[in-house]
Amino acid sequence: MGLPWYRVHTVVLNDPGRLISVHLMHTALVSGWAGSMALYELAVFDPSDPVLDPMWRQGMFVIPFMTRIGVSKSWGGWIITGDTSTDAGIWSYEGVAAAHIILSGLLFLAAIWHWVYWDLDLFRDDRTGKPSLDLPKIFGIHLFLSGVLCFSFGAFHVTGLFGPGIWISDPYGLTGKVEPVDPAWGAEGFDPFIPGGIASHHIAAGVLGILAGLFHLSVRPPQRLYKALRMGNVETVLSSSIAAVFFAAFVVSGTMWYGSAATPIELFGPTRYQWDQGYFQQEIERRIRLGEAENLSLSQVWSKIPEKLAFYDYIGNNPAKGGLFRAGAMDNGDGIAVGWLGHALFKDREGRELFVRRMPTFFETFPVVLVDGEGVVRADVPFRRAESKYSVEQVGVTVDFFGGELDGASFSDPATVKKYARRAQLGEIFEFDRATLKSDGVFRSSPRGWFTFGHTTFALIFFFGHIWHGARTLFRDVFAGIDPDLDAQVEFGAFQKLGDPSTKKQAV
């Protein structure tokens, strides 16, 4: 018949056996990619420094998703938290990857079988002898099975009854580990940052899915509704399936970009809003005030700040700083973080403490301005030195370091002070190794940014796909001139094609 490339999928439009076959092959490809990608990431992943070189800095994409649902050990003898392991068991990172690859192979064989044996008695109506699918019943079966899976995940896997639990951490991403979670049945379960909501919502949604599946298995749709929504046409299934997928894609884009209990910052990196709102900076200041209240010295107080917390408070970990089309991991941008230099405290010659104004997310360059505690500009690095009033040299700015590698160091040389003032624009100051990976110094986004961009883009494309296929199935008689009640079955690939003279137009 000579179908153009953009219409080749119509060969399975009226062929249930081969429709199953291509779906099996698609699932085989997805599962095979997941397993292969996991093995590739495990081959290049360095688990030695979970604090300064975590998975999201290294550009891992599959490993964070495995980790958040309870996989934490490797056959290589390491645990994602930095400890060592002697008995990882079968459900290690490598075990899960291998399971996906084995599943992919079995699905591949099943796809071939269904392609060869496409004309099964299962697809024929006993009353008429013609091939037909009971789509409402199939919908009920799928709904029931997905409900069972959803319920089981929430009731057993997440709660630890039969499974490891999920990744749980504190609000600042410091103490994360895999542990069981109790369902949250109160109003707190609707807080996107409460892990208990993951368990309770899966249980509730699973029960709803099971009940809805049983309903659709036992109750037939009214004839008018059946005809109005073209429930006998498999393109209706395609349209509604695309709707479910694009809706889910939009939802997970939001939970990833804005943050949630399901997207921990230890696995996917911080969100941009945590930089914009000074989220980690405020927590650090709170800890400093508590330390000062105990009459500890600044050096002692800052030495107590976890390096992990300080590292979050650095603009290079902001997923919105990396351009969407800058390929590579964060480590390929500013480099591999080696150590925290400590907190830089600036003062002018009058002894006033000065604070460097931090760079906003969407700036590549930003003027170096130092303000006092009341927000009054006291020093800067001027663009035009001839007109400057507040230059570091004129104001006599010095910098002292507390905590970190430069603890106790003090600098008054203007060139050195300006160097650290520029770096303080970017948050806490860290030393980076840019030689190992030949890092180019240009910020990259984290997997949080890639995931959001990809899922938002595909959700938009799938939205148009839903409109397209929904319109095609609802207005088939208008677009193709084919009677919507036509149930004739002919050779697969030669039915209801636009411009195909062999297709019957009217029901006899």
UniProtKB/Swiss-Prot annotation:
Entries under Pfam families matching the protein: PSII (PF00421)
Molecular function, one GO term: electron transporter, transferring electrons within the cyclic electron transport pathway of photosynthesis activity
Protein name per UniProt: Photosystem II CP47 reaction center protein
GO CC, any one term: chloroplast thylakoid membrane
Described purpose of this protein according to its UniProt entry: One of the components of the core complex of photosystem II (PSII). It binds chlorophyll and helps catalyze the primary light-induced photochemical processes of PSII. PSII is a light-driven water:plastoquinone oxidoreductase, using light energy to abstract electrons from H(2)O, generating O(2) and a proton gradient subsequently used for ATP formation.
Cofactor note as given: Binds multiple chlorophylls. PSII binds additional chlorophylls, carotenoids and specific lipids.
Organism: Adiantum capillus-veneris
Membrane topology recorded in Swiss-Prot or TrEMBL: Multi-pass membrane protein
Predominant location: plastid
Similarity comment text for this entry: Belongs to the PsbB/PsbC family. PsbB subfamily.
Segments crossing the lipid bilayer: 21-36, 101-115, 140-156, 203-218, 237-252, 457-472
Compartments, as annotated in UniProt: Plastid, Chloroplast thylakoid membrane
Keywords noted in UniProt: Chlorophyll, Chloroplast, Chromophore, Membrane, Photosynthesis, Photosystem II, Plastid, Thylakoid, Transmembrane, Transmembrane helix
BP GO annotations: photosynthetic electron transport in photosystem II
SS bond partners: none
InterPro entries the record matches: PS_antenna-like (IPR000932), PS_II_antenna-like_sf (IPR036001), PSII_PsbB (IPR017486)
Known partners and oligomeric status: PSII is composed of 1 copy each of membrane proteins PsbA, PsbB, PsbC, PsbD, PsbE, PsbF, PsbH, PsbI, PsbJ, PsbK, PsbL, PsbM, PsbT, PsbX, PsbY, PsbZ, Psb30/Ycf12, at least 3 peripheral proteins of the oxygen-evolving complex and a large number of cofactors. It forms dimeric complexes.
